[in-house]
Swiss-Prot record:
Binds 1 Fe(2+) ion per subunit. The keyword Metal-binding applies. PROSITE patterns: FE2OG_OXY. It is an enzyme of class 1 (oxidoreductase). Residues 78-177 form the Fe2OG dioxygenase domain. This is PKHD-type hydroxylase YbiX. GO terms for molecular function: 2-oxoglutarate-dependent dioxygenase activity; iron ion binding; L-ascorbic acid binding. The gene is ybiX. It comes from Escherichia coli O7:K1 (strain IAI39 / ExPEC).
């Protein structure tokens, strides 16, 4: 399943990020991809050795960790270190699949269950640059407002179309979920969403308590901690 997570960063945060990223050191984006991806990748990324990068990636981690909808949809166990990319002048990233595992500075290795893109450019400021994701439900073309995030299975083939006008800037990361299976994770998210909706409409009740009990027992049964 694919999820749109709105308002991860406020407009003020986005403006501040963009101002700081204007001063960043950018390098060839192929430095963080494998042999297959390098053949179709043509973009730039912020140098991960820079002081600015360390500060910005911490802010992204804090923002996603504090977002209730992100947590409900991803049920994250481990988050990768966020990266930042930039596309301009017809730069693109052809269809590819993300690697199944990635190195992690604290955990050694992590499994990539979910991929996330946090948009940092206003969609009207550039042409092209759509994230295209192929999954079992078809093809999805994504171009979200700045500050919004899209979450999708890392097993999906995906690409970024050429940016023919303007500049597309984004942050991206990977998530190892407590729930490895996409279908089980989607069921838990649907159950959680409906429980919260019922609570907001009707308040607490024995029926809602029973559904909460079911949710946590399923999470207990399926989670890998």
């Amino acid at each position: 399943m694919m999820y749109h997570i709105p308002g991860v960063l406020s407009p003020q945060d986005v403006a501040r990020f963009r101002e700081q990223l204007e001063q960043a050191e950018w390098v060839d984006g192929r430095v963080t991809t494998g042999a297959q991806g390098a053949q179709v990748k043509n973009n730039q990324q912020v140098d991960t050795r820079s002081t600015l990068y360390a500060a910005l990636q911490n802010e992204v981690l804090n923002a996603v960790n504090q977002h209730a909808l992100f947590f409900a949809a991803a049920l994250p166990r481990t988050l990768s270190t966020p990266l930042f990319n930039r596309y301009q002048n017809n730069e693109t990233y052809g269809f590819h699949v993300d690697g199944a595992v990635r190195s992690h500075p604290q955990n050694g290795w992590m499994r990539t269950d979910l991929s996330a893109t946090l948009f940092l450019s206003d969609p009207q400021s550039y042409d092209g640059g759509e994230l295209v994701v192929n999954d079992t439900f078809g093809q999805h073309r994504v171009k979200l407002p700045a500050g919004d995030l899209v979450l999708y299975p890392s097993s999906s083939l995906h690409c970024v179309t050429p940016v023919t006008r303007g500049v597309r800037v984004a942050s991206f990361m990977w998530i190892q979920s407590m729930i490895r299976d996409d279908k089980k994770r989607a069921m838990l998210f649907e159950l959680d969403t409906n429980i919260q909706s019922l609570k907001s409409r009707h308040g607490e009740s024995e029926e809602i308590l029973s559904l909460l009990n079911l949710y946590h027992n399923l999470l207990r049964e399926w989670s890998e901690i």
